[in-house]
Amino acid sequence: TPDHQRYVELFIVVDHGMYTKYNGD
């Protein structure tokens, strides 16, 4: 469902943000 896709994209964005936060700098 489109709603499910939105959650998947949101999860990817958050996951990438966490990865950058802990592995960046």
From Swiss-Prot:
Cofactor binding annotation: Binds 1 zinc ion per subunit.
Residues bound to Ca(2+): 9
GO biological process terms, semicolon-separated: proteolysis
Swiss-Prot/TrEMBL keywords: Calcium, Fibrinogenolytic toxin, Hemostasis impairing toxin, Hydrolase, Metal-binding, Protease, Secreted, Toxin, Zinc
SUPFAM superfamilies hit by this protein: Metalloproteases ('zincins'), catalytic domain (SSF55486)
Subcellular location: Secreted
Cofactor: Zn(2+)
Tissues and organs where the protein is expressed, per its UniProt entry: Expressed by the venom gland.
Misc: Acidic protein of about 24 kDa.
Family: Belongs to the venom metalloproteinase (M12B) family.
Function, as annotated: Metalloprotease that is highly active against alpha-(FGA) and beta-chains (FGB) of fibrinogen molecules.
Assembly with partners or alone: Monomer.
UniProt protein name: Snake venom metalloproteinase catroxase
Species of origin: Crotalus atrox (Western diamondback rattlesnake)
